[in-house]
Amino acid sequence: MQRLTLYHKVCSNMEEKEIIINGHEAVDLGLSVKWATCNIGATKPEECGDYFAWGETSPKNVYTEETYLYYDAANNRKLIDIGTEISGTEYDAARKQWGDDWRMPAEEELYELLRDCLWQWFTINGVNGYKVIGPNGNSYFLPAAGTSDPEYPEYNECGYYWTGSFSDEDCHWDALCLKFNDDEFGHYSTYSHPYEGLTIRPVTDKSN
């Protein structure tokens, strides 16, 4: 994986209010979108939930190039083109699992979360992760859910969260995700192979 950028910023405080959309709780962090308080497939903030390959809308048992729905083995191992921004489309797992009001975060929404929020390494019921505090003082918890890779699960050590954005520049052919841990790098944007199983924290429009 390739590390890109690290951001930090101090934020303020205000009372949080419960927001329920299609049966799922959202929190207004004072950003351009509201964020879900749980991962897809989770019922509590500290639960990992389900893992998804990028552009696939259902979890599965094995995550490899060969099992990836958009892997084109007959065409020099290239990927079937589903676009470079799938947030809100038919390839969006958040929209498929939670309904049209929810979607995967786009690139600019991830950068906003990194740039404008205070990130504090935190533990809930034995699960490590980050408490993310927005500019308005509201917060949510992102568990270190690791990946679906049985050899390097990294559960309780690292978190990997998909966005809906993809890069095909310079033969990169990888999708943008958030990665975090508690070491010197903290939290940053990076790219991951689209066939890997990562978690998703959905967003919803501010108007919802």
Please place each PLM-identified region on the residue numbering.
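Conserved positions within compact, well-structured domain cores
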Residues: C11-N208
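Short, Lys/Arg-enriched N-terminal segments with co-localized hydrophobic residues
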Residues: M1-N13
